[in-house]
Amino acid sequence: MKFFLDTAFVEEIRAAKEWGILDGVTTNPTLVAKTGKGFMEVVQDILNIVEGPVSIEVVAQDAQGMVEQAQQLRRLGEQVVIKIPATQEGIKAVKVLSQEGIPTNVTLIFQPLQALLAAKAGATYVSPFVGRLEDIGHDAMDLVFDIKNIFDNYGFETQIIVASIRHPKHVLDAARMGADICTVPFKVMEQLFKHALTDRGLEQFLADWSKVPGRPF
């Protein structure tokens, strides 16, 4: 499974890259707004750091506007992936962009038929939002399970990006189901490393090591 970082903060991206596990980045207008910086400045900074796919969202609501914004964004770099909402106009735009060879990430997916339509239109990725579904009382991982089965049934090459990750259990469940990618907030990514017994064991090892005579380091 690949790991994308769901952020627009370059400090977080640099840290994850240093860990050696960063495969890409996803952004959205909300994340960019949180930086307090200009849109193009944020995007260019991210593209200068990340070698893998970087999802950047259009804000137009009509298909033609989405396509025009997508074409403009794609000129920023080959790693740019266009985030498109799972609407009728969005799916129309995905079809056009797929024919132009521009990769797309269909976002705000909350039911499996949206993912099916996106894949039919040629989407490169689909992003089911599990955290937001849980917020309204749904078993969100059922959505990922259904999308994975549908894609396997029909041989779609569209990859599943599990998004709106709230805790490590979401990542674990996604990995168990065979999702292609998880896009994870930085704070959750940090939690993936942690276990109390790891810390306790390391503390004990270091304490014991300090008692070893003639230590080389």
UniProtKB/Swiss-Prot annotation:
- Name the pathway it acts in: Carbohydrate degradation; pentose phosphate pathway; D-glyceraldehyde 3-phosphate and beta-D-fructose 6-phosphate from D-ribose 5-phosphate and D-xylulose 5-phosphate (non-oxidative stage): step 2/3
UniProt keyword Cytoplasm present:
yes
Pfam families from the entry? TAL_FSA
The record's annotation in InterPro entries points to:
Aldolase_TIM, TAL/FSA, Transaldolase_3B, Transaldolase_3B/F6P_aldolase, Transaldolase_AS, TSA/FSA_arc/bac
What keywords is this UniProt entry annotated with? Answer: Cytoplasm, Pentose shunt, Schiff base, Transferase
Say if the entry is tagged with keyword Nucleotide-binding. Answer: no
GO CC terms in record: cytoplasm
Q: Which SUPFAM superfamilies match?
A: Aldolase
Q: What is its EC number?
A: 2.2.1.2
Molecular function terms, GO-annotated? aldehyde-lyase activity; transaldolase activity
Reactions catalysed, semicolon-separated, are:
D-sedoheptulose 7-phosphate + D-glyceraldehyde 3-phosphate = D-erythrose 4-phosphate + beta-D-fructose 6-phosphate
GO BP terms: carbohydrate metabolic process; pentose-phosphate shunt
Q: What is its main location?
A: cytoplasm
Q: What class of enzyme is it?
A: transferase
- Subcellular location(s) per record: Cytoplasm
- Which Gene3D superfamilies does the annotation name? Aldolase class I (3.20.20.70)
Q: Which domain of life is it from?
A: Bacteria
Q: Which residues form the active site?
A: 83
**What biological function has been recorded for the protein in this entry?**
Transaldolase is important for the balance of metabolites in the pentose-phosphate pathway.
- Similarity comment: Belongs to the transaldolase family. Type 3B subfamily.
Q: What is this protein called?
A: Probable transaldolase
This protein's species is Coprothermobacter proteolyticus (strain ATCC 35245 / DSM 5265 / OCM 4 / BT)
